[in-house]
């Protein structure tokens, strides 16, 4: 009698995806982030579901319903802060996951990479809508500023913005629809994750050397399940430390004041994980130009396979490219810092320099450095 794990139509799929999956024997901890993102999204859906049981998507009661969750619901404060800080963890892992993909040339798997970029856009949109729901000052003004960017689209812009708002300003209709979209989007994300994994398992995982590893594969279970569990425990340690010791560390104090359309906060800024893109948006004085730069700052990831000029896939044996990648990371940290600063000198010029260098590193320096490395190796 054959093993049920290998014969049952449903269990067989799980077996081929997580148990008997042939995996390169040398993948490092950088390959842990995929599974951590899966766990993160599951946690977000569970905590979000419990929050939705008590939350009311109405401008008059939204803010007080969040207060009610924190004060009166059993462990409501824990659910709320686990959800808010879980989003931060999600983005940290997302950026690590993308960074690993760039470093080791994982973007060569075109379908997996492109579905991943669609996932990134979907997660960013979902997180943005979630930030609006508590209906604090930064929620309201963040929603107003970011949705207003669409008015820069020629001809249809202003109509489009009013259509999204459901009126002439961010109001009850906007909050209700944002809650509906914020609720449905994680399930759409989960469907995209399945497609992402489907494409990945067509080719198999990449590995740190960037070489074909077909001759050296090991089963996913128990080797990588135990490794993933270690990553999971470390993630839970970080998340619980953040949630229990400093839950408001990554939040904005302005969001503890209820939304007031008549009072603009001195510095409107999004959550920390969007600050790099926000800095790029602000560094261009033209509205449409800023919006295009903002979109292109993420969309540029789709060009990476076309910009890959090296004859090696991974950066493991390419020290010059490694230096450039770490320069890019430093640049993104600077952009994140600038995004949280007021629009005044010297921050304006630092932001403009960092924005220009961001695009220069990816579009010009990285491809030319790769060509130079090819020459150094006489290839």
UniProtKB/Swiss-Prot annotation:
The chain crosses the membrane at residues 33-53, 77-98, 113-133, 178-198, 226-246, 288-308, 320-340, 347-367. Gene3D superfamilies: Cytochrome Bc1 Complex, Chain C. One of its GO terms (cellular component) is respiratory chain complex III. Keywords: Electron transport, Heme, Iron, Membrane, Metal-binding, Mitochondrion, Mitochondrion inner membrane, Respiratory chain, Transmembrane, Transmembrane helix, Transport, Ubiquinone. Heme b b566 binds at residues 97, 196. Signal peptide: none annotated. GO terms for molecular function: metal ion binding; ubiquinol-cytochrome-c reductase activity. Heme b b562 binds at residues 83, 182. SUPFAM superfamilies: a domain/subunit of cytochrome bc1 complex (Ubiquinol-cytochrome c reductase) (SSF81648), Transmembrane di-heme cytochromes (SSF81342). Its cofactor is heme b. GO terms for biological process: mitochondrial electron transport, ubiquinol to cytochrome c. Belongs to the cytochrome b family. The cytochrome bc1 complex contains 11 subunits: 3 respiratory subunits (MT-CYB, CYC1 and UQCRFS1), 2 core proteins (UQCRC1 and UQCRC2) and 6 low-molecular weight proteins (UQCRH/QCR6, UQCRB/QCR7, UQCRQ/QCR8, UQCR10/QCR9, UQCR11/QCR10 and a cleavage product of UQCRFS1). This cytochrome bc1 complex then forms a dimer. Component of the ubiquinol-cytochrome c reductase complex (complex III or cytochrome b-c1 complex) that is part of the mitochondrial respiratory chain. The b-c1 complex mediates electron transfer from ubiquinol to cytochrome c. Contributes to the generation of a proton gradient across the mitochondrial membrane that is then used for ATP synthesis. Heme 1 (or BL or b562) is low-potential and absorbs at about 562 nm, and heme 2 (or BH or b566) is high-potential and absorbs at about 566 nm. This is Cytochrome b. It comes from Trinomys setosus (Hairy Atlantic spiny rat).
């Amino acid at each position: 009698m054959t093993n049920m794990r290998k014969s049952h139509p449903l269990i067989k799929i799980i077996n081929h995806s997580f148990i008997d999956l042939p995996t390169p024997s040398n993948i490092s901890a950088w390959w842990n982030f995929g599974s951590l993102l899966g766990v993160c999204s599951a946690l977000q859906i569970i905590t979000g579901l419990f929050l939705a049981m008590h939350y009311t998507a109405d401008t008059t009661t939204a803010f007080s319903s969040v207060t009610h969750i924190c004060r009166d619901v059993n462990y409501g404060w824990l659910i709320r802060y686990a959800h808010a800080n879980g989003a931060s963890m999600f983005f940290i892992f997302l950026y690590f996951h993308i960074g690993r993909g760039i470093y080791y040339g994982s973007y060569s798997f075109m379908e997996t990479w492109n579905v991943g970029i669609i996932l990134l856009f979907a997660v960013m949109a979902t997180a943005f809508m979630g930030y609006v729901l508590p209906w604090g000052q930064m929620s309201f003004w963040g929603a107003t500023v970011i949705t207003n960017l669409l008015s820069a689209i020629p001809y249809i812009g202003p109509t489009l913005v009013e259509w999204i708002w459901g009126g002439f300003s961010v109001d009850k209709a906007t909050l209700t629809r944002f809650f509906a979209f914020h609720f449905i989007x994680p399930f759409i994300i989960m469907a995209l994750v399945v497609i992402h994994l489907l494409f990945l398992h067509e080719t198999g995982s990449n590995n740190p050397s960037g070489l074909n590893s077909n001759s050296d594969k090991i089963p996913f279970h128990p080797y990588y399940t135990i490794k993933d569990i270690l990553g999971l425990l470390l993630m839970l340690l970080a998340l619980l430390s953040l949630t229990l010791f400093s839950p408001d560390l990554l939040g904005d104090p302005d969001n503890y004041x209820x939304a007031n359309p008549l009072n603009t906060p001195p510095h409107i800024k999004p959550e920390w994980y969007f600050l790099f893109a926000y800095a790029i948006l602000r560094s261009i004085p033209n509205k449409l130009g800023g919006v295009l730069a903002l979109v292109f700052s993420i969309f540029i990831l789709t060009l990476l396979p076309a910009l890959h000029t090296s004859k090696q896939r991974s950066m493991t044996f390419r020290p010059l490219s490694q230096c450039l990648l770490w320069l890019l990371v430093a640049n993104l940290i600077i952009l994140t810092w600038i995004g949280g600063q007021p629009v005044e000198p010297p921050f304006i010029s630092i932001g403009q320099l960092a924005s220009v260098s961001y695009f220069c590193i990816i579009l010009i320096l990285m491809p030319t450095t790769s060509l130079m490395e090819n020459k150094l190796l006489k290839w």
